[in-house]
């Protein structure tokens, strides 16, 4: 009898202690007060979906989402080569959910690296997946809002990988030493002022100075796309969880306060490709791009580009003697055509403009991606602008000056010279810098080197084409855009030659505040996806009354002595 009484008393005491613990638990979390508030507000509001209202009310008191897993998958980029997709999973309201993913393609500083075998891409993707698996426990429990902290962790993780890759390559060089490359022999040319055949005896000759040797290209570490893809995926996860468009999230990372007006980047749209991979003799124009006049919307710009492109196709078909010409498309998303003269692609565009009622230099401008680093013949020490036609770095300056004098609608030259030809870059800046943008793409330092140097003066250019590839983090992108603006240069956000399918580049361009965006042409899906995203962003800004327009093209002052500036556009209001 006494045993039963004692057992009942023990159970009663345990129930009492449990009730006290529950009361203390709910008291600490203010559950009873918030539950009372929720019930009162629900009764007063009388929502149609009572449980939906209660769910929304209590959601504001839930813990912030945290990363619970990072996963990597092998996917294909826009050219069918393997790359890596980084997926971010977060714990949201006690549930593990897949939030988003991102894909970026690998790109090399070396022009020939893009021609590597498929097994190298496979190897890089496999390593990237392993890196993402290794990074998963390091990021577990962190908030996607901690972009700077996560990017620093990624950079710290990546730094030893660079050293390992350098050591591996050094060991390979020591094991199988490469033969020394022959230095280009000095080139002789007639003395200035001497005409061929003038005077008696031998003609005086001038020995041209040998070109600077090619700099050692920055090594691309296999697996590096894992870093850039994961950094972007974290930014996307934060924007998804906060229900904020990615471009607004990026701008918030850049500025403490969001601006009241956003300026859409002006698209540089690829129309033709006449580079080293195209048929015909012409090598100089890897891309011929159009730049719409200021004051136009992205929609108006794309409509104009599409109209011009269709007219060019008609002209090519009309000139073909065998019926409609086969439309070869470059990975850049534009038509690949042959040319035998430097002016030939420009003449084709001029003729198309006349047919559709557009005026070059008024409605639209031209840009040329020269990709000079792909034209250099190191044995001759000259650029092969046409098959069998070679130009020294000094002669290239005369070529560009003459070309722009004959076609003043050319607004920009991309990579007109190698980065090593710094003296000629300075001469070109003096000759054309006040009326033509001189952009460095492959001629620019890598993003990490730009941030280390804190300078945009090598080479002296109007601005830089920045691409989100390999190990570049979102924080580094923010830093390099701040540097470009601080140096009063022009920022261009571009895509690599082999681009992945995704539209985040458009958000990055708007969020980072790029003046121009270079996405390629309109003939490949991975390119048009990004243009479509630009259109969607423009529509959102229009609906919000926050869309602004550039009113003129301003050229940075590159040197103390420059030629007179080119024609300015009349400001427009829309």
Swiss-Prot record:
Keywords annotated in UniProt: Glycolysis, Lyase
Protein name: Enolase 4
EC number(s) on file: 4.2.1.11
A Gene Ontology BP annotation from the UniProt entry: glycolytic process
Biased amino acid composition, Basic and acidic residues: 165-175
Biased composition (Pro residues): 179-189
GO MF, one example: magnesium ion binding
GO cellular component terms given for this protein: phosphopyruvate hydratase complex
Family to which the UniProt record says this protein belongs: Belongs to the enolase family.
Ranges that cross the membrane: none
Active-site annotation: 467 (proton acceptor)
